[in-house]
Each structure stands twice: as structure tokens, then as C-alpha cells.
Amino acid sequence: MVADIKGNEQIEKYSWREACDTGSSRMDRKHGKYILNVEHSENQPPITHPNDQEAHSSICWCLPSNDITSDVSPNLTGVCVNPGILAHSRCLQSESCNTQVKEYCRNDWSMWKVFLACLLACVIMTAIGVLIICLVNNKGSANSSIVIQLSTNDGECVTVKPGTPSPACPPTMTTTSTVPASTATESTTSTATAATTSTEPITVAPTDHL
């Protein structure tokens, strides 16, 4: 009984493979489309797998001739496809898409880094230029000369600059006071009348009275 059960299991394992009478299958990836090149051979014996898991994982899919693309010969009646291969190919395709997206993001981020670096360099150069201009203007205002003009006794004007020795003749300090015109005229008239009264001769008439 045990031998019969094992024999039936082996027949069920390889019944799918014997139903699909195919030779060797090769899968090539070309422009996002998978092409199956299958060579029909009748004399090739079915391939046996030592492990049961590998035998169960391989399933023969019998596809009609209408569903096959033009790259496959029209005489093909069935194609044996391993689901593990298809899953592996899908994983490779998704990984390639992920790598392409990551590369695009990296390129985009690198462009942003270059733009920010250029902007920061422009700001730094502008700040340095403004600082240099401010320092130059401050030095120019510090070196500005102060001119002092002094009048001497002769009426000449002497200019004195900071950092130069003072002239030999001391300056005369002149004070000017403003007097109203009415008071000045009154003082002149009073002095004139006083002068006239003082200069008049005094005549004494002689009187002879006995």
C-alpha cells in the first residue's frame, strides 16, 4: 500500500510536465517584453527534481497559440513556465524601477545642492563687498581736514590745519558789541552841545558906579 501511494504521488508530480511536451525554455528581457524561445523536442525525457518542493513549484501552463506573441513560433502548443522565474523577473523589474527612481531623486537633490551653494556664495560675496565699502568710507571721513581761520593784527587771515604747528603771531581776539542806533545818536548830540557851551566866551560888562 505504501509503495502504491508513493507511485501515485510521483505520477501526479510529473503529470503536468509530461502533458506539456516542451524542450528547453529561455527567457530574455528585451525592451520591457519577455520573449520565450522554446524548441519543440519529442525525444527529450522529462526533467526530474530530487526535492518535492522544487517539483511542486514548477507548473506547466498550456497556452493556446492565439495568446502567443509574434516572436514565438506559431507551432508552439504549450509552454512550461516556472512561477518562481516569473516572480524573480517581476522582482528584478521592480528593483530596477526603484533604482531608477532613486537615481533620479539623487540627481535632483544634487542640483538643489549646487543651487543652494551658489546662492550662499553670492550672499557671502555681497556682504564682504558692503563691509569693504563701509570701511573705506569711514577711513575717508577720519582723514578729513579741519580748517581754522584766524585774523592777525595786520588783517591777514591765517589757516591752521590739524597736525601743523600754529603760526608765530598770536591771533587778536576782537569783540564786537551791538549798540542800538538811537542811543548812539543821543550820545553824539550831547557831546556836541557840551562842546559848544564850553567854548562860548563869557563877557562881563563893567559897571562904574560911584
Curated annotation (Swiss-Prot):
Q: Name one GO cellular component term.
A: Golgi membrane
Report the leader peptide range.
Answer: none
The UniProt keywords, alphabetically, are:
Cell membrane, Golgi apparatus, Membrane, Signal-anchor, Transmembrane, Transmembrane helix
Q: Does the keyword Membrane apply?
A: yes
Q: Which residues lie on this side of the membrane: Cytoplasmic?
A: 1-113
For this protein, the record's InterPro entries field holds:
CLLAC, Dynactin-associated
Region spans: Disordered: 168-210
Protein task: Plays a role in the regulation of cell proliferation. Promotes activation of the AKT1 signaling pathway. Promotes phosphorylation of AKT1 at 'Ser-473'.
What protein am I looking at? Dynactin-associated protein
Originating species = Homo sapiens (Human)
Q: What is the lineage of its organism?
A: Eukaryota, Metazoa, Chordata, Craniata, Vertebrata
- Gene encoding the protein: DYNAP
